[in-house]
């Protein structure tokens, strides 16, 4: 369950309750339907069904109307505790409920909820009665496929999604936001703006960057490398595959194998595509001996990794099988840890601001029940993370017990223009890999000690970050990131020589600029380039040619007439240099 959901929250209870109402409505309209599960989720609810005959979204309105009829009864939601034997009898015609019940302890009682003419296997909680739900405050939004228990080997069920709010005004506000999200979907804009494609026949989850998208990606990566070099990082390059002993030693084959691609056999050895970069960076560290005087090492890599994501989990470039991780590892001594964490936080905040993200949230994850390392290292590292966070104006919450077994961490989330949170940066202590790979350094007292290792990502994966940027800006990238920054449009052939002069002047200064001297009508050209979200159109008429000026039309339809050519160049280059948003 998303940690954004609080079971005691009234909206959570309403959404849980309306899911039961939906299941009853579906059963009334489609009597032979088998019912699976239906929880509340962030922004709404869903329920999974096995229909005898597949339904379409045309059926959603009928289901909504039946739901409103049920709500009018004002029926109560009543909890009852029963034995496993009773549950098996009640749900004997519901195979998915039976599958769940068989996993329960026979000695324990099972919780069910009754409402109107419906009984469901459920822990709750729910509202007291249906009068608490505004019948105008919900809507069924979509239909999707979902495997039972998320396993591709199981039956494909039909999942009906819905949303519910406290009142109709909140619902309308959410639906308007949802429409805007659809318009900005990175998969839709990726095709319209010719940024990337995914070819199922070649391989699901594998991203092809087209020239426009590749240009933006290159700009992001160039900026990343430049800033990392400025901030004391050394850039690494490591292979894409490694022998099985490496992944055995790291623990990936024990704990992460289901997310790895199958092994490849070559030269009497087994190789795996790398799911992470960490063991390769450690291999570089272990090529020599190190003194405390050498530390800290700050090693960063844009390393392509491969993870076997289930088909149903893939989502454009946001969730892919091959992607480039913005990875870094800081290897340091005990006394250096606090300064290094503070510096990573400062760096993360700076990087996000350059891409237009100034609203951040942080989550500090503490020690889980099962962990490696000693208590003193955990306590020290948690104090360091908390002290580092307290020095920045970033609100944070404690995620008690949410740390990985190998160390505590800070997760940084950004908030986009559609008010959605995205988990991006991670700062993670690791007490596991230094032990597994026997990483050491010679301390000041001459003894061999274990260094502290901090995993750190700022952008996450380049592909996912690119997808977030597309949706955040609706495809209208900032000037410095736009694949084409301006188009020159001469109004007729008589001014073409001057248009070429303007083109060469801007191009020679490094601008990504295009000259359109085709015979199409000017208004059609302007509409085309605004649709392509190109920041500037330079309109060259006879007056501009005579006075050596340009008139600028922006993608948002603003107009600046008669700007001196050199002044325009100076202003635009300044915006690009400063990475103005």
Swiss-Prot record:
Parts of the chain that traverse the membrane: none
GO cellular component: cytoplasm
Any one biological process term the GO annotation gives: threonyl-tRNA aminoacylation
Binding site for Zn(2+): 278, 329, 455
InterPro entries: aa-tRNA-synt_IIb, aa-tRNA-synth_II, aa-tRNA-synth_II/BPL/LPL, Anticodon-bd, Anticodon-bd_dom_sf, Thr-tRNA-ligase_IIa, Thr/Ala-tRNA-synth_IIc_edit, ThrRS_anticodon
Catalysed reaction, written as an equation: tRNA(Thr) + L-threonine + ATP = L-threonyl-tRNA(Thr) + AMP + diphosphate + H(+)
Keywords noted in UniProt: Aminoacyl-tRNA synthetase, ATP-binding, Cytoplasm, Ligase, Metal-binding, Nucleotide-binding, Protein biosynthesis, RNA-binding, tRNA-binding, Zinc
Subcellular location, record wording: Cytoplasm
Subunit record text: Homodimer.
Protein name: Threonine--tRNA ligase
Gene for this chain: thrS
């Amino acid at each position: 369950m998303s940690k954004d959901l609080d079971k005691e929250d009234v909206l959570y209870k309403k959404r849980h309750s309306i899911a039961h109402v939906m299941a009853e409505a579906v059963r009334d309209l489609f009597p032979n339907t088998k019912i699976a599960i239906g929880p509340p989720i962030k922004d709404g609810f869903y329920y999974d069904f096995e229909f005898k005959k597949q339904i379409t979204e045309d059926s959603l309105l009928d289901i909504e109307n039946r739901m409103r009829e049920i709500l009018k009864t004002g029926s109560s939601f009543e909890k009852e505790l029963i034995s496993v034997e009773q549950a098996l009898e009640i749900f004997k015609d519901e195979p998915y409920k039976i599958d769940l019940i068989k996993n329960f302890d026979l000695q324990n009682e099972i919780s069910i909820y009754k409402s109107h003419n419906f009984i469901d296997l459920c822990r709750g909680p729910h509202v007291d009665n249906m009068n608490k739900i505004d019948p105008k405050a919900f809507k069924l939004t979509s239909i999707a496929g979902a495997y039972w228990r998320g396993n591709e080997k199981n039956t494909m069920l039909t999942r009906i999604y819905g949303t519910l709010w406290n009142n109709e005004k909140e619902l309308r506000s959410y639906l308007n936001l949802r429409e805007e999200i659809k318009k900005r979907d990175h998969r839709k804009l990726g095709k319209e703006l010719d940024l990337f494609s995914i070819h199922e026949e070649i391989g699901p989850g594998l991203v092809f960057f087209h020239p426009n998208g590749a240009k933006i990606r290159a700009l992001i990566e160039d900026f990343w490398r430049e800033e990392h070099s400025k901030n004391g990082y050394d850039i690494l390059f490591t292979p894409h595959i490694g022998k099985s002993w490496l992944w055995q030693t790291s623990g990936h084959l024990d704990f992460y194998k289901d997310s790895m691609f199958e092994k490849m056999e070559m030269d009497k050895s087994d190789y795996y595509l790398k799911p992470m970069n960490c063991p390769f960076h450690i291999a570089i560290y272990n090529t020599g001996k190190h003194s405390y005087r050498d530390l800290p090492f700050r090693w960063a890599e844009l390393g392509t990794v491969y993870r076997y994501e289930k088909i149903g989990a893939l989502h454009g470039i946001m969730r892919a099988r091959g992607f480039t991780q913005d990875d870094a590892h800081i290897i340091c001594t005990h006394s250096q840890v606090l300064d290094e964490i503070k510096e990573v936080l400062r760096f993360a905040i700076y990087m996000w601001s350059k891409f237009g993200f100034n609203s951040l949230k942080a989550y500090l994850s503490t020690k889980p029940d099962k962990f490696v390392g000693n208590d003193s290292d955990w306590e020290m590292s948690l104090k360091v993370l908390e002290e580092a966070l307290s020095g920045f104006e970033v609100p944070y919450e404690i995620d008690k017990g949410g740390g990985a077994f190998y160390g505590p961490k800070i997760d940084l989330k950004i908030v986009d223009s559609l008010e959605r949170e995205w988990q991006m940066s991670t700062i993670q202590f690791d007490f596991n890999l230094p032990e597994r790979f026997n990483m050491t350094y010679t301390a000041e007292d001459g003894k061999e000690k274990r260094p502290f290792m901090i995993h750190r990502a700022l952008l996450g994966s380049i592909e996912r970050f690119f997808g977030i940027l597309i949706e955040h800006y609706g495809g209208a990238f900032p000037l410095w990131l736009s694949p084409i920054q301006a188009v020159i449009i001469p109004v007729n052939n008589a001014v073409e020589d001057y248009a070429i002069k303007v083109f060469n002047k801007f191009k020679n200064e490094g601008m990504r600029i295009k000259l359109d001297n085709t015979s199409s009508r000017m208004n059609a050209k302007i509409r085309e380039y605004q649709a392509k979200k190109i920041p500037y159109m330079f309109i060259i008429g006879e007056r501009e040619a005579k006075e050596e000026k340009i008139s600028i039309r922006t993608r948002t339809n603003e107009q600046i007439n008669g700007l001196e050519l050199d002044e325009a160049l100076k202003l635009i280059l300044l915006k690009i240099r400063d990475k103005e948003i």
